[in-house]
Amino acid sequence: GQRVENHSNIVSEAALTGKTINIIDAYSSTAFKFTGTKKFDRGTGYRSKSFLTIPLKNAQNYVIGVLQLINSIEPQTGNVVPFGRDIEPLVEALASQAAVALENQNLIESQKHLLDSFVRLMAGTVDAKSPYTAGHCQRVPVLTEMLTQAACDSAKAPFADFSLNEEQWYELHIAAWLHDCGKVTTPEYVVDKATKLETITDRLHEIRMRFEVVKREAVIECQQKMLDGARNGVELKQILDERLRSLDDDFEFVAECNRGGEFMDEERIQRLQQIAGIQWTRTLNDRLGIAQEELNRKSQQPEASLPVKENLLADRADHIIAHDTVVYSADPLNPYGFQVEVPPHKYNLGEVYNLSIARGTLTTEERFKINDHIVQTIVMLESLPFPQHMEGVPEIAGGHHEKMDGTGYPKKLKGTEMSVPARIMAIADVFEALTAADRPYKKAKTLSESINIMAGMVKDHHLDGELFKLFLESGVYQDYATKYLESYQLDDICLDDYLAAD
C-alpha cells in the first residue's frame, strides 16, 4: 500500500526530517502525542519531561537511526531541566560519532550476511552438480556443529577444556559449508560414472554395435562359403550358429564387466583380453567430424589404410589424455604440503583398461580426479584473504579426508597434527556419506551398519577414537538420525559393543 509517514511521533519526525528536536516538557507539548512515553510513566512512576532527539546520519547524509536523550539534570539542584540550545551542537557531534559506529556495525553485519549467502550459494552449487551428492554440503555442517557442541559441553577428558568462542564458531561454520567447494572443478561425468565405460555417454553402446558388425561379418562369410560350395551347407549353418551364440555370450560378459558389480579376478581379465582380440572390419575414416582435441590425439599415430581390421576392444594411444596443467600435488615442493601420488595421465579411456577395473567403476586416474577436489578446496580457500580470526578455515575444511595414522589425503597428516574441528568434520563427512538416502547409485546404510563401519575405521586408526566415543555417548548420532534418516534406516544399536571395546 501507500507509504504513510508518522509525524506525530517525535522519533519518527526526527528520522523523516533529519532535524534535531528539543522538547521542554513532553506533557505540555502539542507537537507530539508522546502516547508511549505517558504509558511508560504510568506503569513505572517515572516522570519523562525534557527530550532531545537527534537523527543519526551516515557519510551520505542518510538517517540510519535516532539518538534520544531524556530528562536533562541540573547538577546543582538535581532537578529536571530543558536541554540547553548551546549543547545541541555538542550532542549532534557525538551523534555523528555514534552514526559512524552504527554504520560500521551495519557494514560488518552486511558483509557477514553477504559472505554467508555466498558460502551457502557455493555449497548449493556443489550439491546441484550431481544427484550423487545432493544435500551433502548442507548436512555435513549440521552434524559438524552438533558434534562440536557436544565436545564443548563435555566435562570429561580429553574435551573438558575444549571450547569455542563466537569467532571460532563462525570460523567452523564457514569451513563446514565450504569443505567440498573444490568439487566445482570435478567433471560431472567422473563423479556420476555409473559404469566402467561411461564418459559423457556409456561407450558400451559403441561396443555393442561392433559385436553386431562382427556377427554380420560371420553371417556374410558363411553365406559366401555356401555360394562357393566349398563345404556342406548344414555344417556351415551349425558353425555359424555356434559362432553367433559365442559372440552373444561374449557380449553379455563384457556388459556384465561394464556394470562393475563383480571383482575382476585374473580369470575374468584373461577372458576379457581374449574377447578384445576378436577383430572387425572398419571401412570408414575415424578421423572425420571429430573434435579437434581428439583429432590431435589420433594424429600422433599414422593413419591406417582402409579397410582395416581392428580389435573388438582396444586400448589405443588416443585413449590417453595428458594432464593439461601442472598438478599442484605433483610437485614435492608445493607450498601446501600435499603428499599425493599423481597418475601419469589425466585420463585413460582405454576400453580394456576400463573394463579391467578390479572393483567399482573408477580408474586410478578418475579416482585421483575425484580425490583432487580436496586439493582444490585447500588451494581455493588458501587464496582467500580471510581475516585473522578465520585463518583456520582452510585447515578445518581441508582435513576431512586425512586419517589419524597419517595415511590420509592430501597431506598425510596424523591426528595429532589436526585441530579438533578438523577431526570432527572427518567423522561428520563419513557418517553423512554412509547414511545419505539421496544417492541414486547406492542404498543408504542403516544406523547400525554405519556405526559398525565407522567403528572399523576407528580400529584401523582412520577416525578419531575419542570423538567417535563422544559421538555415541552424547547421542549426537541419534539426534541427527531422527531428523535426517529414513524410517527404514533407524534400527537399534548396542552402544556397549562399541564403548566397551574402547
Language-model-derived ranges and their functions:
Residues 20, 30-32, 108-116, 156-163, ...:
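Short, glycine/acidic-rich hinge or "gate" loops at secondary-structure transitions
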Residues 1-47, 333-339, 351-357, 363-364, ...:
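Regulatory sensory and allosteric helical modules in signal-transduction proteins
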Residues 62-64, 70-94, 362-364, 441-444:
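Regulatory loop-to-helix N-cap segments in sensory/regulatory domains
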Residues 54, 59, 70-72, 416:
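Output-coupling edge of small sensory domains
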